[in-house]
A protein has these predicted regions:
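Acidic, proline/glycine-enriched N-terminal capping motif
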Residues: 1-148
Length: 148
């Protein structure tokens, strides 16, 4: 069974809607750069490994740099589109997905021992009191169907 585990450093980005100019859809530079970061990280780790040909299960976990609201489906869309043709032939093969977002704690330790205060810009990122750096965790596995 083919299985890929990937960690992409940096703040996860949502896939932006393409802008239409003269009847043509144009993907913005920020989205292209973010997709390229996912693609490049996959190629760096797995080289020219053959993409999965069968059904795919994917698990995505987005460790966010802020509590700014982002739709989970647009976060997932960027990652799954970036892996088309490298991890799997096409994202239509994805038949099972689990997506989660990890947001930084609203409250952080205060200056006095045992106290808490509201998180401010520039505070370390904490989840349940544990520090982290923004990144995306991706787990992809082929679903083996014994009847095929």
């Amino acid at each position: 069974m083919n299985c890929f585990d990937l960690t992409v450093p940096g703040d996860p980005l949502s896939k932006a809607r393409p802008r239409v100019y003269n009847g043509h859809g144009i993907t913005d530079r920020r989205t292209r750069n973010a997709e390229n970061r996912v693609y490049s990280e996959f190629r760096r780790k797995y080289g020219d490994m053959e993409p999965i040909k069968g059904d795919v299960r994917i698990r995505l976990k987005f460790w966010m740099a802020s509590r700014h609201p982002r739709d989970w489906d647009n976060l997932a869309k960027l990652a799954t589109d970036a892996l088309n043709g490298v991890a799997y032939q096409d994202d239509v093969q994805i038949v099972e997905a689990q997506v989660s977002k990890v947001l930084p704690d609203r409250r952080v330790p205060g200056s006095k021992p045992g106290t808490m205060r509201n998180r401010k810009t520039g505070d370390p990122l904490l989840f349940m009191g544990e520090p982290y750096e923004p990144h995306t965790e991706i787990h992809i596995s082929e679903i083996i169907n014994p009847t095929n």
